C-alpha cells in the first residue's frame, strides 16, 4: 500500500525540477508501461487505479509477479497522473545515467 508520503513524492515527479533532481519519471498507460519495462530502464513501482485493476486482472498478475505493484483509489491516481483522463496504470521509472563520451579528436570548449 502506498503511504501518503510516497503519494506526495510521486506526484512531485510531475514537475520537471523534481524529475531531474530524483532522476525518475512517470509513464502512463499500459503500452508505455510495457515499453518502459522492455527497455533498460529500471522500474521502481507500477501503480494502478482500483477500477483498472478490477477491469484488467491479467495485467495486475503479470506485473505483480516481478515488480512492486500498488493499487490505489481513483482520486489518488489522479494526483500522480498528468493526463486529464488517465487510463489507470502508471509506472515510476529511473532515468538511466549515460556518461558523456568525448572522442580524442574532439575538443571541449
Where do the protein language model's features map onto the residues?
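Boundary-proximal intrinsically disordered activation/regulatory segments immediately upstream
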Residues: 1-57, 61
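Glycine-rich nucleotide phosphate-binding loop and flanking beta-alpha elements
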Residues: 33, 54, 78, 97-99
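Short loop/helix-cap segments at secondary-structure boundaries that form the rim of catalytic
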Residues: 58-64, 100-103
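Structural motif
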Residues: 24, 44-46, 68-70, 87-91, ...
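RNA substrate-binding interface of SAM-dependent RNA methyltransferases
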Residues: 34, 38, 75, 102-109
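Glycine/small-residue-rich loop that forms an oxyanion/phosphate-binding "nest" at active or ligand-binding sites
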Residues: 61-94
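Glycine-/acidic-rich phosphate or pyrophosphate-binding loops and their flanking alpha/beta elements
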Residues: 92-105
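Short gly/ser/thr-rich secondary-structure transition/capping motifs
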Residues: 10, 28, 72, 93-96
Amino acid at each position: 500500500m502506498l503511504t501518503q508520503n510516497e503519494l506526495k513524492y510521486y506526484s512531485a515527479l510531475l514537475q520537471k525540477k523534481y524529475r531531474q533532481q530524483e532522476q525518475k519519471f512517470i509513464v502512463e498507460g499500459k503500452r508505455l508501461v510495457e515499453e518502459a519495462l522492455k527497455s533498460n530502464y529500471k522500474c521502481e513501482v507500477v501503480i494502478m487505479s482500483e477500477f483498472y485493476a478490477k477491469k484488467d486482472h491479467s495485467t495486475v498478475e503479470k506485473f505483480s509477479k516481478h515488480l512492486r505493484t500498488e493499487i490505489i483509489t481513483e482520486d489518488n491516481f489522479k494526483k500522480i497522473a498528468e493526463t486529464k483522463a488517465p487510463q489507470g496504470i502508471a509506472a515510476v521509472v529511473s532515468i538511466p545515467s549515460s556518461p558523456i563520451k568525448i572522442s580524442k579528436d574532439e575538443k571541449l570548449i
